[in-house]
Amino acid sequence: MNLIQKYDFQIKLMVILLSIIQPFILMSICGELWSISNYWKSPLQPMFIIVNAATSYFFFSTDRWVIPSIFLLLLTAFSLEMYPTIHNVFAGCFFLSCIYPLLTLKRFKFFGLLYLLSILVLLLVGMLWFEIYCVLILGSYHLTILIYKHNLDK
């Protein structure tokens, strides 16, 4: 058993928690910007890249989350600053590709319904809060599944 396998639960837990708190760290240090991707231009760019890459790696190892994983990695690789159109297409594809795995759940179906409500957040309060809402739903879902499976394995 290698080191990653040995600490799989702890690593995944850390990645999920970092992805959930990242937007709030970004906002508390750099203020509120138009979208999470706008923090690419901030001093916290390394955090943005590392958390997205780690989340993408986590998604890639999770059933039904390979496509969102690829889109998350691509939107991170193509910065908003240098490739705005490509970045925005990949960002849109990422958020849209998360719908299918959430709506086809056998357990915890309410996460899919909560995720669909994100369109109201977008219309009512804007892109940044839409993205944060989606990240919170995704993080909460993956945290719930991680803990559920961990407890089953005990």
Task: List the model feature ranges, each with a label.
Residues 20, 48-59, 94-107, 134-149:
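Hydrophobic cores of alpha-helical transmembrane segments in multi-pass inner/ER membrane proteins
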Residues 1-5, 32-34, 60-63, 80-82, ...:
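Juxtamembrane membrane-water interface segments of multi-pass membrane proteins
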Residues 22-27, 59, 72-78, 101, ...:
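Membrane-embedded alpha-helices of multi-pass membrane proteins, especially ion channels
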Residues 28-32, 77-83, 121-129:
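Juxtamembrane "helix-exit" motif on the non-cytosolic side of transmembrane helices
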Residues 65-113:
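Membrane-proximal helix-loop-helix units in multi-pass membrane proteins
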Residues 1-62:
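N-terminal topogenic module of multi-pass integral membrane proteins
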Residues 109-154:
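Terminal transmembrane helical module of multi-pass membrane proteins
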Residues 12, 16, 66-69, 91, ...:
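Residues within membrane-spanning alpha-helices of integral membrane proteins
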